[in-house]
Structure formats: C-alpha cells, structure tokens
Regions:
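Short glycine/proline- and aromatic-enriched beta-strand/turn motifs that initiate or cap beta-hairpins
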Residues: 24-100, 270, 276-278
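Residues that define the transmembrane beta-barrel architecture of outer-membrane proteins
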Residues: 45-47, 80-84, 91, 120-126, ...
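Residues on the lipid-exposed face of transmembrane beta-strands in outer-membrane beta-barrel proteins
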Residues: 51-53, 86-92, 128-132, 154-156, ...
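Short loop/turn motifs that connect adjacent beta-strands in outer-membrane beta-barrel proteins
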Residues: 39-47, 135-149, 201-205, 236-239
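Transmembrane beta-strands of outer-membrane beta-barrel pores
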Residues: 55-59, 92-96, 101-107, 134, ...
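Predominantly the C-terminal beta-signal and adjacent terminal strand-loop region
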Residues: 27, 228-279
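Outer-membrane beta-barrel translocator domains and adjoining extracellular loop/strand segments
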Residues: 62-68, 109-114, 143, 162-172, ...
C-alpha cells in the first residue's frame, strides 16, 4: 500500500518529466488566422501580423514506469503560481513564421509526518515553426465564402525546466544529512513537422484541423511526440477573432540505461480558448 509520501514523490517525478504541465501549447497556426481567409486573395496585403493570448484548460495522464498518475485541470492549476501563453505570427503571402510561448512558475509545499518538501519549477516551452500554404482554394461570392486551405509546417519545440527541490525535517535538533537541496535544469529540443487545414463554414466562422509529429529520438529529444487539434475561429471584427476548440498531445520519453531505464508516456488533453489581435 502506497503512503502519501510515495504519492508526493510520484507527483514530483511527474512534474520533472511533464514539460507541458500547465497547457502546453495551443496550435499557433490555427489561432486567429481567420481574417486572412475572410479576405479575397486579390485584396490581401502581402504582410499580416497577429498576437494571440490563449489558455489550454488541460488535464493530464502520465505513466512513469509502472506507475500511473492522473491529474485534472484543477489539480495542475493548483501548482501554478504564475503563467501565460502567447502566439506571435508574421505572414508574408504564402509564408508564415510563428512562435508559441508558454511560461509557467510552478511550486508547492508538501508535508508527510516531519518531512517537509518544497519544490519550485520555472518552465519555458517555445514552439517555433515555418509554414507554407500549399493549397488555397477559397471562393468569394456575393453572399457566401466557401473553400479550404492547407499549410505544411516544420519547426522545433524547445522545452526547459529549472527545478529546485528542498527537503527538511521538522525537528528541534539538527539531523545529519538535512536539509537536502536539489537543483537541476532539464531541457531538450524536438524537431516537428505538421500540417493544418482551414475550412470556411460561413462569412465569420472558420474550422481548423491541425496535426504535428516529431521528436524521433534525435539526441535527447522525445522518442515520439504527436498532437492533434480542432478549433472554431469566429470573426468578431476586422482586428479581433475568438477561438475555441480542443487539443490532445502525446509524448514518449526515456531516461537512464539498462536497469535504470525509465519510460514515460504523457497524454495531455482538454479544451482551449483564445483571442487574436490581427494587425
């Protein structure tokens, strides 16, 4: 039978490996691009820009070796002291450059008997992609807009966790070996390729479908990473769009060798919400 202290250690291990705790990443190619599609190609400006704050209200399922950890969105946000997510995108004709930043400052204190554990994590996830529109078939009629477009993308996701763990005993006398202080930085880069499809549903509604795959075990990257999302983007005005949808991502990582090999499988999923300012 596992003690609460065992569960605490499992949660810390989960945080070490799950570099997408608070939300990792809403797909930047779908957030707020509607205004480009709602404009006739003949009338589009060569350059367009957008800034899109968003939130992924995700829960997580994590398998670390033979142990299984399940955490809801409320569980994850209870560990988050500060965080934000933002997409910035520049488009030139059929070319796009987008960067999706997630920053989170995580931390908590846990106590089991006389043992006190404090942990803090500064987390950065930076997803940068180049994209090219390979299909652009939108039909602009007098009263309707219909059609679809597809982009191919390639880029990298940079994952970084600065981790600090302090363990001490609540004791009136000094205990040899305590306090224990652990500080470590864990980071790696995943190469990713993908595509996103945008389908016009009406003059003010755009459906987006997106998928990416990467990692491939290159260097210390994920053995395999993939994600899928769908979004509905609503045109509010010429400068503002609102996006709502759902996303799921999976990541498989390995650490150690031989008997010390630890395999981790992370599944993160949930609804996402965002707004975009189109310039």
């Amino acid at each position: 039978m596992k003690t609460n202290f065992d569960k605490i250690l499992l949660i810390i291990v989960f945080i070490f490996y799950n570099t997408n705790i608070f939300s990792q990443e809403k797909d930047e190619d779908d957030a707020g691009t509607a205004n480009t599609e709602f404009i006739d190609k003949k009338e589009r400006k060569p350059w367009s820009f957008k800034l899109a704050p968003y939130a992924w209200l995700a829960g997580t399922s994590t398998d670390v070796g033979s142990e299984k950890i399940r955490q809801s969105f409320n569980d994850l946000t209870s560990l988050t002291n500060f965080g934000f997510q933002m997409v910035a995108q520049a488009r030139y004709k059929k070319w796009t450059l987008s960067s999706n930043l997630t920053y989170a400052k995580l931390g908590d204190q846990m106590k089991e008997g006389r043992m006190i554990i404090d942990f803090a994590i500064d987390q950065i996830i930076l997803d940068t992609k180049f994209g090219y529109t390979i299909i652009d078939k939108f039909d602009f009629g007098d009263d309707i807009i219909r059609g679809w477009a597809m982009d191919a993308t390639i880029g990298v996701i940079y994952w970084s966790n600065d981790i600090a763990v302090d363990a001490d005993l609540d004791s009136p006398i000094e205990i040899p070996g305590f306090p224990v202080n652990i500080s470590e930085k864990m980071d790696y880069v995943d190469l990713v390729v993908g595509t996103n499809i945008r389908i016009i549903l009406s003059k003010s509604v755009l459906l987006g479908l997106s998928g990416n795959i990467g990692g491939f075990g290159i260097g210390n990257s994920s053995k395999l990473y993939w994600d899928f999302s769908f979004t509905n983007t609503f045109k509010v005005s010429k400068l503002l769009t609102v996006t709502a949808g759902y996303k799921s991502f999976n990541a498989k990582t390995e650490s150690g060798e031989g008997e010390d090999l630890v395999k981790t499988h992370i599944k993160t999923f949930g609804p996402l919400l965002g707004v975009a300012f189109n310039l």
